[in-house]
Amino acid sequence: PPGSLMRDKLLAWDASWFVRLAEGGYPKSYEYGPTGELLGSTLAFFPGYPLLIKAVAAVTRTDHATTAIALAWIFGAAVALLLCALATRLWNRRIALALVALVCVQPMSVVFTMAYSEPMFLALVLASLLAVQRNRWVLAGLFGFAAGLTRPTGAALSLALIVAAVLYVRRPENGPRRWWALAWAFIACLGVPVYLAWVGARLGEPNAWFRVQSAGWGTTFDYGAMVWKFIRDALRAGDGWVQLSGAAFFLLLYAI
């Protein structure tokens, strides 16, 4: 709203959930509304980012909200540096700088300045992929595992690491120790299921995380259906810059 501090804007929406989680931890049961309806809770949010907020705040003796914003800015800068390094290795520095610019100006890059988990997650993803390019499979696996504990989309990184490891193993010139690549790629795959299993054990249902997520935010795995619905609706009836530019960005990525 008008008159609110910029700090409040950087701590809006999901950011407030992360700060709350860093301060109070996870609940031990489902949370319900006054009429008995299931509510969303901090259990919907993966632990990587809030745990780091809590640890850094304890060491630096700063409040959790300030720590959350500072970490997001640091990881946002790391995203730019790591993307530049990875793209330079894959193509050249000119393309790398263009990619960094594209990422930084796309509509939702605003989350790189907010207390969101996206900056940390993307930095871990890029670090893992860069480690793969350098055949540093231990680091790739560790960064991949950490990414899986940061956001559920870590599952997509896990798939990429498995494919890369299989291709690496198929080349005999990489030596007998090349099979370790598969082992570390598998370790990277554990981040997401470990947290989902922990939530299930805590609440007594294997699908507990999905229930909390659906109750609080109405989101489920739909194999990309909502993305295409967003693009279609934005192009047909959207009149806002975020909606239209977001749809155009998705279409540009698809074309590339």
Name every feature range the model reports, one short phrase each:
Residues 91-93, 128-139, 169-172:
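Membrane-interface transmembrane helices that cradle and orient dolichyl/undecaprenyl
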Residues 104, 125-130, 138-165, 187-190:
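Membrane-interface alpha helices of multi-pass inner-membrane proteins
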Residues 74, 90-91, 105, 109, ...:
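Transmembrane helix irregularities
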Residues 114-120:
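Short acidic/glycine- and proline-prone juxtamembrane loop motifs at membrane-interface regions
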Residues 12-61, 223-231:
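Short hydrophobic/aromatic helix or loop-helix immediately within or flanking a transmembrane segment
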Residues 54-55, 67-90, 255-256:
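Transmembrane-helix motifs of polytopic, lipid-linked glycan transferases
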Residues 63-67, 83-105:
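Transmembrane-helix signature of polytopic, membrane-embedded enzymes
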Residues 1, 10, 158-171, 175-256:
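Membrane-lumen/periplasm interface segments of specific transmembrane helices
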